[in-house]
Amino acid sequence: MASPALEELVLNSRHRLVRGLKQQKASADQIEEEVAKLLKLKAQLGHDESKQKFVLKTPKGTRDYSPRQMAVREKVFDVIICCFKRHGAEVIDTPVFELKETLMGKYGQDCKLIYDLKDQGGELLSLRYDLTVPFGRYLAMNNLTNIKRYHIAKVYRRDNPAMTRGRYLNSITVDFDIAGQFDPMIPDAECLKIMCEILSSLQIGKFLVKVNDRRILDGMFAVCGVPDSKFRTICSSVDKLDKVSWEEVKNEMVGEKGLAPEVADRIGDYVQQHGEVCLVEQLLQDPKLSQNKQAVEGLGDLKLLFEYLTLFGIDDKISFDLSLARGLDYYTGVIYVAVLLQMPTGAGEEPWCGQCGCWRRYDGLVGMFDPKGRKVPCVGLSIGVERIFSIVEQRLEALEEKVRTTETQVLVASAQKKLAGGETKACLQLWDAGIKAELLYKKNPKLLNQLQYCEETGIPLVAIIGEQELKDGVIKLRSVASREEVDVRREDLVEEIRRRTNQPLYVC
Protein backbone atom coordinates (compact mmCIF):
# COMPACT_ATOMS: atom_id res chain seq x y z
CA MET A 1 0.00 0.00 0.00
CA ALA A 2 1.37 3.40 -0.98
CA SER A 3 2.08 5.97 1.71
CA PRO A 4 -0.36 8.89 2.18
CA ALA A 5 2.33 11.26 0.94
CA LEU A 6 2.75 9.29 -2.29
CA GLU A 7 -1.01 9.10 -2.80
CA GLU A 8 -1.28 12.86 -2.38
CA LEU A 9 1.56 13.33 -4.87
CA VAL A 10 -0.21 11.19 -7.49
CA LEU A 11 -3.50 13.00 -6.95
CA ASN A 12 -1.87 16.42 -7.23
CA SER A 13 -0.23 15.33 -10.47
CA ARG A 14 -3.63 14.35 -11.89
CA HIS A 15 -5.15 17.64 -10.72
CA ARG A 16 -2.38 19.60 -12.48
CA LEU A 17 -2.97 17.62 -15.66
CA VAL A 18 -6.68 18.50 -15.67
CA ARG A 19 -5.98 22.17 -14.93
CA GLY A 20 -3.39 22.26 -17.71
CA LEU A 21 -5.84 20.84 -20.25
CA LYS A 22 -8.41 23.47 -19.29
CA GLN A 23 -5.87 26.28 -19.61
CA GLN A 24 -4.81 24.95 -23.03
CA LYS A 25 -8.49 24.84 -24.03
CA ALA A 26 -8.28 21.17 -24.91
CA SER A 27 -11.34 19.40 -26.26
CA ALA A 28 -14.22 18.77 -23.87
CA ASP A 29 -13.95 15.02 -24.51
CA GLN A 30 -10.27 14.96 -23.52
CA ILE A 31 -10.93 16.96 -20.36
CA GLU A 32 -13.86 14.71 -19.41
CA GLU A 33 -11.69 11.63 -19.93
CA GLU A 34 -8.97 12.91 -17.59
CA VAL A 35 -11.54 14.03 -14.99
CA ALA A 36 -13.04 10.54 -15.07
CA LYS A 37 -9.58 9.04 -14.49
CA LEU A 38 -9.04 11.42 -11.57
CA LEU A 39 -12.35 10.46 -9.94
CA LYS A 40 -11.59 6.77 -10.45
CA LEU A 41 -8.19 7.20 -8.83
CA LYS A 42 -9.77 8.96 -5.85
CA ALA A 43 -12.21 6.09 -5.44
CA GLN A 44 -9.41 3.50 -5.62
CA LEU A 45 -7.37 5.33 -3.00
CA GLY A 46 -10.38 5.78 -0.77
CA HIS A 47 -9.93 9.51 -0.97
CA ASP A 48 -12.54 11.05 1.30
CA GLU A 49 -13.61 14.46 0.06
CA SER A 50 -15.52 15.07 3.29
CA LYS A 51 -12.23 15.24 5.21
CA GLN A 52 -11.11 18.18 3.13
CA LYS A 53 -12.04 21.70 4.10
CA PHE A 54 -15.30 22.67 2.40
CA VAL A 55 -15.19 26.04 0.66
CA LEU A 56 -18.58 27.71 0.55
CA LYS A 57 -18.89 29.30 -2.88
CA THR A 58 -20.92 29.30 -6.08
CA PRO A 59 -19.75 26.99 -8.88
CA LYS A 60 -17.24 28.39 -11.35
CA GLY A 61 -18.87 30.57 -13.98
CA THR A 62 -21.94 31.35 -11.86
CA ARG A 63 -22.88 34.04 -9.36
CA ASP A 64 -25.52 35.20 -6.90
CA TYR A 65 -27.38 38.48 -7.27
CA SER A 66 -27.96 40.90 -4.40
CA PRO A 67 -31.21 42.88 -4.01
CA ARG A 68 -29.45 45.89 -5.54
CA GLN A 69 -28.29 43.88 -8.55
CA MET A 70 -31.74 42.36 -8.99
CA ALA A 71 -33.30 45.83 -8.90
CA VAL A 72 -31.01 46.86 -11.76
CA ARG A 73 -31.91 43.71 -13.71
CA GLU A 74 -35.63 44.31 -13.24
CA LYS A 75 -35.32 47.84 -14.61
CA VAL A 76 -33.48 46.51 -17.68
CA PHE A 77 -36.15 43.85 -18.20
CA ASP A 78 -38.90 46.46 -17.85
CA VAL A 79 -37.39 48.46 -20.73
CA ILE A 80 -37.00 45.36 -22.91
CA ILE A 81 -40.44 43.86 -22.23
CA CYS A 82 -42.14 47.23 -22.73
CA CYS A 83 -40.53 47.45 -26.17
CA PHE A 84 -41.56 43.90 -27.10
CA LYS A 85 -45.16 44.55 -26.08
CA ARG A 86 -45.17 47.82 -27.98
CA HIS A 87 -44.40 45.79 -31.09
CA GLY A 88 -47.22 43.31 -30.44
CA ALA A 89 -45.32 40.29 -29.10
CA GLU A 90 -46.76 37.43 -27.05
CA VAL A 91 -44.78 35.56 -24.40
CA ILE A 92 -44.14 31.79 -24.22
CA ASP A 93 -42.07 29.43 -22.08
CA THR A 94 -40.46 26.04 -22.76
CA PRO A 95 -38.78 23.40 -20.53
CA VAL A 96 -35.29 24.12 -19.25
CA PHE A 97 -34.18 20.80 -20.73
CA GLU A 98 -35.00 19.13 -24.03
CA LEU A 99 -34.59 15.69 -25.54
CA LYS A 100 -30.93 15.44 -26.53
CA GLU A 101 -31.99 14.50 -30.06
CA THR A 102 -33.85 17.82 -30.35
CA LEU A 103 -30.66 19.81 -29.81
CA MET A 104 -28.14 17.68 -31.67
CA GLY A 105 -27.13 18.71 -35.18
CA LYS A 106 -28.26 22.33 -34.77
CA TYR A 107 -25.14 24.04 -33.41
CA GLY A 108 -22.20 22.71 -35.44
CA GLN A 109 -18.99 22.62 -33.39
CA ASP A 110 -20.79 24.28 -30.48
CA CYS A 111 -22.59 20.97 -29.77
CA LYS A 112 -19.69 20.13 -27.46
CA LEU A 113 -20.80 23.01 -25.20
CA ILE A 114 -24.19 21.42 -24.45
CA TYR A 115 -24.76 20.10 -20.91
CA ASP A 116 -26.02 16.50 -20.97
CA LEU A 117 -28.12 15.14 -18.09
CA LYS A 118 -28.08 11.63 -16.69
CA ASP A 119 -30.54 9.15 -18.18
CA GLN A 120 -34.02 9.80 -16.78
CA GLY A 121 -36.49 6.98 -17.36
CA GLY A 122 -34.99 6.03 -20.70
CA GLU A 123 -34.93 9.57 -22.16
CA LEU A 124 -31.60 11.20 -23.01
CA LEU A 125 -31.89 14.85 -21.98
CA SER A 126 -29.78 18.00 -22.31
CA LEU A 127 -30.05 21.50 -20.87
CA ARG A 128 -31.12 24.00 -23.50
CA TYR A 129 -28.25 25.79 -25.24
CA ASP A 130 -30.41 28.64 -26.56
CA LEU A 131 -34.09 29.56 -26.83
CA THR A 132 -34.34 29.38 -30.61
CA VAL A 133 -34.18 25.61 -31.18
CA PRO A 134 -36.83 24.98 -28.46
CA PHE A 135 -38.97 27.64 -30.19
CA GLY A 136 -38.63 25.79 -33.50
CA ARG A 137 -39.67 22.57 -31.80
CA TYR A 138 -42.62 24.40 -30.19
CA LEU A 139 -43.82 25.68 -33.57
CA ALA A 140 -43.59 22.23 -35.18
CA MET A 141 -45.33 20.45 -32.28
CA ASN A 142 -48.24 22.90 -32.27
CA ASN A 143 -48.52 23.30 -36.05
CA LEU A 144 -48.03 27.07 -35.73
CA THR A 145 -47.13 29.04 -38.83
CA ASN A 146 -47.58 32.61 -37.59
CA ILE A 147 -46.55 34.14 -34.26
CA LYS A 148 -44.60 37.08 -32.87
CA ARG A 149 -43.20 36.01 -29.52
CA TYR A 150 -40.65 36.85 -26.85
CA HIS A 151 -39.06 34.54 -24.31
CA ILE A 152 -36.81 35.41 -21.35
CA ALA A 153 -35.11 32.46 -19.64
CA LYS A 154 -31.80 30.89 -18.65
CA VAL A 155 -29.62 28.92 -21.06
CA TYR A 156 -26.63 26.73 -20.24
CA ARG A 157 -23.29 26.47 -22.05
CA ARG A 158 -20.07 24.67 -21.07
CA ASP A 159 -18.00 27.60 -22.28
CA ASN A 160 -15.03 29.44 -20.80
CA PRO A 161 -16.64 32.00 -18.48
CA ALA A 162 -15.53 35.64 -18.44
CA MET A 163 -17.28 37.11 -15.41
CA THR A 164 -16.11 40.70 -15.91
CA ARG A 165 -17.54 40.72 -19.44
CA GLY A 166 -20.85 39.18 -18.41
CA ARG A 167 -20.23 35.67 -19.79
CA TYR A 168 -21.39 32.87 -17.48
CA LEU A 169 -22.02 29.13 -17.71
CA ASN A 170 -25.69 29.80 -17.08
CA SER A 171 -27.08 33.09 -18.27
CA ILE A 172 -30.31 34.87 -19.01
CA THR A 173 -31.17 35.11 -22.70
CA VAL A 174 -33.82 37.40 -24.14
CA ASP A 175 -35.31 36.34 -27.48
CA PHE A 176 -37.78 38.02 -29.81
CA ASP A 177 -38.89 36.18 -32.97
CA ILE A 178 -41.31 36.63 -35.84
CA ALA A 179 -42.53 33.45 -37.52
CA GLY A 180 -44.64 33.50 -40.67
CA GLN A 181 -44.78 34.30 -44.36
CA PHE A 182 -44.42 38.06 -44.89
CA ASP A 183 -43.09 40.46 -47.49
CA PRO A 184 -39.27 40.26 -47.72
CA MET A 185 -37.14 42.08 -45.16
CA ILE A 186 -39.98 43.79 -43.25
CA PRO A 187 -39.72 41.46 -40.19
CA ASP A 188 -35.91 41.72 -40.36
CA ALA A 189 -36.10 45.51 -40.35
CA GLU A 190 -38.50 45.48 -37.39
CA CYS A 191 -36.08 43.29 -35.41
CA LEU A 192 -33.31 45.80 -36.08
CA LYS A 193 -35.60 48.65 -35.09
CA ILE A 194 -36.45 46.88 -31.81
CA MET A 195 -32.80 46.36 -30.90
CA CYS A 196 -31.97 49.99 -31.62
CA GLU A 197 -34.93 51.13 -29.50
CA ILE A 198 -33.84 48.96 -26.58
CA LEU A 199 -30.15 49.92 -26.63
CA SER A 200 -31.04 53.61 -26.96
CA SER A 201 -33.54 53.42 -24.08
CA LEU A 202 -31.02 51.70 -21.79
CA GLN A 203 -28.51 54.53 -22.35
CA ILE A 204 -25.48 52.25 -22.13
CA GLY A 205 -23.36 54.08 -24.69
CA LYS A 206 -22.69 54.05 -28.39
CA PHE A 207 -23.51 50.94 -30.37
CA LEU A 208 -23.27 49.65 -33.91
CA VAL A 209 -25.22 46.92 -35.68
CA LYS A 210 -23.27 44.87 -38.21
CA VAL A 211 -25.18 43.00 -40.92
CA ASN A 212 -24.28 40.34 -43.46
CA ASP A 213 -25.96 37.38 -45.14
CA ARG A 214 -25.09 33.69 -45.09
CA ARG A 215 -25.83 33.52 -48.81
CA ILE A 216 -23.31 36.27 -49.50
CA LEU A 217 -20.71 34.41 -47.43
CA ASP A 218 -21.34 31.11 -49.20
CA GLY A 219 -21.29 32.81 -52.60
CA MET A 220 -18.10 34.67 -51.71
CA PHE A 221 -16.35 31.46 -50.61
CA ALA A 222 -17.49 29.73 -53.79
CA VAL A 223 -16.13 32.40 -56.17
CA CYS A 224 -12.88 32.55 -54.17
CA GLY A 225 -12.35 28.82 -54.66
CA VAL A 226 -13.03 27.46 -51.16
CA PRO A 227 -14.00 23.76 -51.30
CA ASP A 228 -17.57 23.09 -50.12
CA SER A 229 -16.26 20.89 -47.30
CA LYS A 230 -14.32 23.83 -45.84
CA PHE A 231 -17.07 26.49 -45.94
CA ARG A 232 -17.97 26.27 -42.25
CA THR A 233 -14.45 25.97 -40.88
CA ILE A 234 -13.23 28.92 -43.00
CA CYS A 235 -16.33 30.81 -41.86
CA SER A 236 -15.25 30.42 -38.22
CA SER A 237 -11.79 31.80 -39.07
CA VAL A 238 -13.18 34.86 -40.86
CA ASP A 239 -15.43 35.62 -37.89
CA LYS A 240 -12.34 36.23 -35.73
CA LEU A 241 -11.54 39.42 -37.64
CA ASP A 242 -13.27 41.51 -34.98
CA LYS A 243 -10.61 40.32 -32.51
CA VAL A 244 -7.40 39.63 -34.47
CA SER A 245 -5.65 40.93 -37.60
CA TRP A 246 -6.18 39.65 -41.13
CA GLU A 247 -2.65 38.19 -41.17
CA GLU A 248 -3.44 36.03 -38.15
CA VAL A 249 -6.70 34.87 -39.73
CA LYS A 250 -4.93 34.08 -43.01
CA ASN A 251 -2.21 32.10 -41.22
CA GLU A 252 -4.90 30.04 -39.50
CA MET A 253 -6.75 29.33 -42.75
CA VAL A 254 -3.57 28.35 -44.60
CA GLY A 255 -1.48 26.79 -41.85
CA GLU A 256 -4.12 25.02 -39.78
CA LYS A 257 -6.99 24.46 -42.20
CA GLY A 258 -5.10 23.71 -45.40
CA LEU A 259 -6.48 26.49 -47.58
CA ALA A 260 -4.40 27.55 -50.57
CA PRO A 261 -2.67 30.95 -49.98
CA GLU A 262 -4.08 32.45 -53.20
CA VAL A 263 -7.61 31.47 -52.14
CA ALA A 264 -7.06 33.09 -48.74
CA ASP A 265 -5.86 36.28 -50.46
CA ARG A 266 -9.02 36.42 -52.57
CA ILE A 267 -11.13 36.04 -49.41
CA GLY A 268 -9.13 38.84 -47.78
CA ASP A 269 -10.01 41.23 -50.61
CA TYR A 270 -13.69 40.82 -49.69
CA VAL A 271 -13.87 40.34 -45.91
CA GLN A 272 -11.92 43.48 -45.07
CA GLN A 273 -14.66 45.62 -46.60
CA HIS A 274 -17.46 47.27 -44.65
CA GLY A 275 -19.77 50.19 -45.28
CA GLU A 276 -23.33 51.18 -46.04
CA VAL A 277 -25.78 50.48 -48.86
CA CYS A 278 -23.27 51.80 -51.42
CA LEU A 279 -21.08 48.75 -50.68
CA VAL A 280 -24.05 46.50 -51.46
CA GLU A 281 -24.49 48.21 -54.83
CA GLN A 282 -20.75 47.97 -55.48
CA LEU A 283 -20.72 44.21 -54.84
CA LEU A 284 -23.73 43.72 -57.10
CA GLN A 285 -21.45 44.97 -59.89
CA ASP A 286 -18.54 42.74 -58.83
CA PRO A 287 -17.53 40.59 -61.85
CA LYS A 288 -17.35 37.39 -59.78
CA LEU A 289 -20.04 37.81 -57.12
CA SER A 290 -22.57 39.02 -59.67
CA GLN A 291 -22.33 35.60 -61.34
CA ASN A 292 -23.16 33.69 -58.15
CA LYS A 293 -26.90 33.16 -57.60
CA GLN A 294 -26.70 32.88 -53.78
CA ALA A 295 -24.63 36.04 -53.42
CA VAL A 296 -26.92 38.04 -55.72
CA GLU A 297 -30.00 36.95 -53.74
CA GLY A 298 -28.36 37.94 -50.46
CA LEU A 299 -27.18 41.30 -51.79
CA GLY A 300 -30.63 42.01 -53.22
CA ASP A 301 -32.26 41.39 -49.85
CA LEU A 302 -29.70 43.58 -48.08
CA LYS A 303 -30.38 46.43 -50.51
CA LEU A 304 -34.10 46.14 -49.75
CA LEU A 305 -33.35 45.94 -46.02
CA PHE A 306 -31.43 49.23 -46.12
CA GLU A 307 -34.45 50.89 -47.75
CA TYR A 308 -36.61 49.89 -44.76
CA LEU A 309 -33.87 50.89 -42.29
CA THR A 310 -33.82 54.35 -43.84
CA LEU A 311 -37.61 54.49 -43.53
CA PHE A 312 -37.33 53.48 -39.84
CA GLY A 313 -34.67 56.14 -39.27
CA ILE A 314 -31.93 53.77 -38.06
CA ASP A 315 -29.72 53.40 -41.15
CA ASP A 316 -26.99 55.48 -39.46
CA LYS A 317 -26.60 52.77 -36.81
CA ILE A 318 -26.14 49.92 -39.31
CA SER A 319 -22.95 48.75 -41.05
CA PHE A 320 -22.71 46.13 -43.82
CA ASP A 321 -19.68 44.07 -42.71
CA LEU A 322 -18.40 41.20 -44.86
CA SER A 323 -16.29 39.85 -41.98
CA LEU A 324 -19.42 39.02 -39.98
CA ALA A 325 -19.45 35.26 -40.45
CA ARG A 326 -20.90 33.79 -37.29
CA GLY A 327 -23.98 31.66 -37.23
CA LEU A 328 -25.21 28.26 -36.20
CA ASP A 329 -26.07 25.42 -38.55
CA TYR A 330 -29.75 26.41 -38.76
CA TYR A 331 -29.09 30.04 -39.81
CA THR A 332 -30.02 30.81 -43.43
CA GLY A 333 -30.28 34.40 -44.70
CA VAL A 334 -29.46 37.72 -43.07
CA ILE A 335 -27.36 37.73 -39.89
CA TYR A 336 -26.81 40.66 -37.56
CA VAL A 337 -24.72 41.48 -34.52
CA ALA A 338 -25.06 44.48 -32.19
CA VAL A 339 -21.87 45.63 -30.49
CA LEU A 340 -21.38 48.18 -27.74
CA LEU A 341 -18.55 50.61 -28.37
CA GLN A 342 -16.84 51.64 -25.14
CA MET A 343 -14.37 54.44 -25.58
CA PRO A 344 -11.21 54.69 -23.42
CA THR A 345 -11.73 56.30 -20.03
CA GLY A 346 -8.08 56.88 -19.21
CA ALA A 347 -4.64 57.41 -20.73
CA GLY A 348 -3.25 54.35 -22.45
CA GLU A 349 -6.57 52.50 -22.53
CA GLU A 350 -7.78 50.98 -25.77
CA PRO A 351 -11.38 51.20 -26.96
CA TRP A 352 -13.19 47.88 -26.95
CA CYS A 353 -16.41 46.52 -28.29
CA GLY A 354 -18.56 43.75 -26.98
CA GLN A 355 -21.41 41.85 -28.55
CA CYS A 356 -24.72 42.51 -26.82
CA GLY A 357 -27.18 41.10 -29.32
CA CYS A 358 -27.54 39.11 -32.51
CA TRP A 359 -30.18 38.37 -35.13
CA ARG A 360 -30.64 35.50 -37.47
CA ARG A 361 -32.95 34.24 -40.15
CA TYR A 362 -33.63 30.54 -39.83
CA ASP A 363 -36.24 29.57 -42.40
CA GLY A 364 -35.36 25.87 -42.28
CA LEU A 365 -35.33 25.16 -38.54
CA VAL A 366 -39.02 24.28 -38.09
CA GLY A 367 -38.80 21.93 -41.07
CA MET A 368 -36.13 19.92 -39.21
CA PHE A 369 -38.80 18.97 -36.66
CA ASP A 370 -41.93 18.81 -38.82
CA PRO A 371 -42.74 15.23 -39.95
CA LYS A 372 -43.58 16.52 -43.44
CA GLY A 373 -40.65 18.92 -43.56
CA ARG A 374 -42.89 21.99 -43.80
CA LYS A 375 -40.88 25.17 -43.47
CA VAL A 376 -41.93 28.24 -41.50
CA PRO A 377 -39.92 31.41 -42.28
CA CYS A 378 -38.50 32.82 -39.03
CA VAL A 379 -36.36 35.76 -38.05
CA GLY A 380 -35.45 36.85 -34.56
CA LEU A 381 -33.03 38.50 -32.19
CA SER A 382 -31.26 37.51 -28.99
CA ILE A 383 -30.11 40.11 -26.48
CA GLY A 384 -27.03 39.46 -24.37
CA VAL A 385 -28.47 40.95 -21.20
CA GLU A 386 -25.71 39.63 -18.91
CA ARG A 387 -23.22 41.94 -20.60
CA ILE A 388 -25.72 44.79 -20.42
CA PHE A 389 -26.25 44.13 -16.69
CA SER A 390 -22.49 44.31 -16.10
CA ILE A 391 -22.21 47.63 -17.93
CA VAL A 392 -25.18 49.17 -16.11
CA GLU A 393 -23.84 48.01 -12.72
CA GLN A 394 -20.39 49.44 -13.45
CA ARG A 395 -21.91 52.74 -14.54
CA LEU A 396 -24.02 53.04 -11.38
CA GLU A 397 -21.02 52.23 -9.19
CA ALA A 398 -18.89 54.84 -10.97
CA LEU A 399 -21.61 57.45 -10.48
CA GLU A 400 -22.17 56.29 -6.88
CA GLU A 401 -25.85 56.31 -7.74
CA LYS A 402 -28.22 54.91 -5.14
CA VAL A 403 -30.51 52.11 -6.30
CA ARG A 404 -33.79 51.40 -4.52
CA THR A 405 -34.29 47.71 -3.81
CA THR A 406 -37.95 48.01 -2.78
CA GLU A 407 -40.95 49.89 -4.17
CA THR A 408 -42.44 50.83 -0.81
CA GLN A 409 -44.32 54.11 -1.14
CA VAL A 410 -45.08 54.82 2.51
CA LEU A 411 -43.91 53.65 5.92
CA VAL A 412 -46.59 53.58 8.61
CA ALA A 413 -44.81 54.84 11.73
CA SER A 414 -45.91 55.13 15.34
CA ALA A 415 -45.03 58.16 17.44
CA GLN A 416 -45.85 56.71 20.89
CA LYS A 417 -45.99 53.38 22.65
CA LYS A 418 -49.10 51.22 22.97
CA LEU A 419 -51.32 52.64 20.24
CA ALA A 420 -53.68 49.64 20.30
CA GLY A 421 -52.69 48.53 16.81
CA GLY A 422 -53.51 51.85 15.16
CA GLU A 423 -50.50 51.65 12.84
CA THR A 424 -51.35 48.05 11.88
CA LYS A 425 -54.93 49.02 10.97
CA ALA A 426 -53.64 51.92 8.88
CA CYS A 427 -51.21 49.62 7.06
CA LEU A 428 -54.02 47.14 6.33
CA GLN A 429 -56.10 49.98 4.92
CA LEU A 430 -53.27 50.90 2.55
CA TRP A 431 -52.57 47.30 1.49
CA ASP A 432 -56.26 46.76 0.71
CA ALA A 433 -56.19 49.87 -1.48
CA GLY A 434 -53.14 48.62 -3.42
CA ILE A 435 -50.69 51.02 -1.78
CA LYS A 436 -47.16 49.65 -1.28
CA ALA A 437 -46.72 50.13 2.46
CA GLU A 438 -44.80 48.61 5.34
CA LEU A 439 -44.27 49.03 9.06
CA LEU A 440 -41.43 48.02 11.35
CA TYR A 441 -41.98 44.86 13.37
CA LYS A 442 -41.10 46.34 16.75
CA LYS A 443 -43.34 47.03 19.73
CA ASN A 444 -41.87 50.39 20.63
CA PRO A 445 -39.78 51.71 17.72
CA LYS A 446 -38.29 55.17 18.04
CA LEU A 447 -39.72 57.65 15.55
CA LEU A 448 -36.24 58.90 14.67
CA ASN A 449 -35.15 55.35 13.76
CA GLN A 450 -38.22 54.95 11.55
CA LEU A 451 -37.49 58.20 9.71
CA GLN A 452 -33.86 57.18 9.27
CA TYR A 453 -34.97 53.84 7.82
CA CYS A 454 -36.98 55.72 5.18
CA GLU A 455 -33.98 57.84 4.22
CA GLU A 456 -31.74 54.77 3.91
CA THR A 457 -34.19 52.78 1.78
CA GLY A 458 -35.59 55.64 -0.29
CA ILE A 459 -39.19 55.45 0.98
CA PRO A 460 -40.70 58.83 0.00
CA LEU A 461 -43.55 59.14 2.54
CA VAL A 462 -44.17 58.44 6.22
CA ALA A 463 -47.65 58.09 7.72
CA ILE A 464 -47.19 59.00 11.40
CA ILE A 465 -49.77 57.90 13.96
CA GLY A 466 -49.79 59.22 17.52
CA GLU A 467 -52.34 59.35 20.37
CA GLN A 468 -53.60 62.78 19.32
CA GLU A 469 -53.93 61.70 15.67
CA LEU A 470 -56.00 58.70 16.75
CA LYS A 471 -58.34 60.94 18.76
CA ASP A 472 -58.73 63.45 15.92
CA GLY A 473 -59.20 60.78 13.24
CA VAL A 474 -56.24 62.04 11.22
CA ILE A 475 -52.82 60.75 10.16
CA LYS A 476 -49.77 62.97 9.83
CA LEU A 477 -48.28 62.47 6.33
CA ARG A 478 -44.62 63.48 6.08
CA SER A 479 -42.47 63.92 2.97
CA VAL A 480 -39.07 62.37 3.72
CA ALA A 481 -37.23 64.60 1.22
CA SER A 482 -38.71 67.99 2.24
CA ARG A 483 -39.70 67.03 5.83
CA GLU A 484 -42.99 68.82 5.23
CA GLU A 485 -45.87 67.42 7.30
CA VAL A 486 -49.63 67.68 6.79
CA ASP A 487 -52.60 66.23 8.67
CA VAL A 488 -54.80 64.04 6.46
CA ARG A 489 -58.15 62.59 7.46
CA ARG A 490 -57.97 58.82 7.66
CA GLU A 491 -60.59 58.32 4.94
CA ASP A 492 -58.60 60.61 2.60
CA LEU A 493 -55.20 58.96 3.22
CA VAL A 494 -55.29 56.59 0.24
CA GLU A 495 -56.26 59.32 -2.21
CA GLU A 496 -53.57 61.69 -0.87
CA ILE A 497 -50.83 59.04 -1.19
CA ARG A 498 -51.95 58.21 -4.71
CA ARG A 499 -51.85 61.88 -5.63
CA ARG A 500 -48.35 62.32 -4.25
CA THR A 501 -46.97 59.14 -5.84
CA ASN A 502 -48.89 59.45 -9.13
CA GLN A 503 -50.27 55.94 -8.68
CA PRO A 504 -53.24 55.01 -10.91
CA LEU A 505 -56.53 54.00 -9.31
CA TYR A 506 -56.14 50.22 -9.44
CA VAL A 507 -54.74 47.53 -7.21
CA CYS A 508 -51.29 46.23 -8.25
From Swiss-Prot:
Known EC number: 6.1.1.21
GO CC field: cytoplasm; cytosol; mitochondrion
Positions of disulphide bridges: none
GO MF annotation terms: ATP binding; histidine-tRNA ligase activity; protein homodimerization activity; RNA binding
Main location: cytoplasm
SMART domains cross-referenced by the UniProt entry: WHEP-TRS
Gene Ontology biological-process annotations: histidyl-tRNA aminoacylation; mitochondrial translation
Keyword Mitochondrion attached: no
Name of the top EC class for this enzyme: ligase
Keyword annotations from UniProtKB, A to Z: Aminoacyl-tRNA synthetase, ATP-binding, Cytoplasm, Ligase, Nucleotide-binding, Phosphoprotein, Protein biosynthesis
Residue ranges occupied by any WHEP-TRS domain in the UniProt entry: 3-59
Phosphoserine modifications at: 66
PROSITE patterns, per the entry: WHEP_TRS_1, WHEP_TRS_2
Gene3D superfamilies per the UniProt record, alphabetical: Anticodon-binding domain (3.40.50.800), Bira Bifunctional Protein, Domain 2 (3.30.930.10), S15/NS1, RNA-binding (1.10.287.10)
Binding positions for L-histidine per the UniProt entry: 130-132, 157, 177, 326, 330-331
Record localization: Cytoplasm
Catalytic activity: tRNA(His) + L-histidine + ATP = L-histidyl-tRNA(His) + AMP + diphosphate + H(+)
Domain of life: Eukaryota
Function, in words: Catalyzes the ATP-dependent ligation of histidine to the 3'-end of its cognate tRNA, via the formation of an aminoacyl-adenylate intermediate (His-AMP). Plays a role in axon guidance.
Family indicated by similarity: Belongs to the class-II aminoacyl-tRNA synthetase family.
PANTHER family: HISTIDINE--TRNA LIGASE, CYTOPLASMIC, HISTIDYL-TRNA SYNTHETASE
UniProt subunit comment: Homodimer.
Protein name per its UniProtKB record: Histidine--tRNA ligase, cytoplasmic
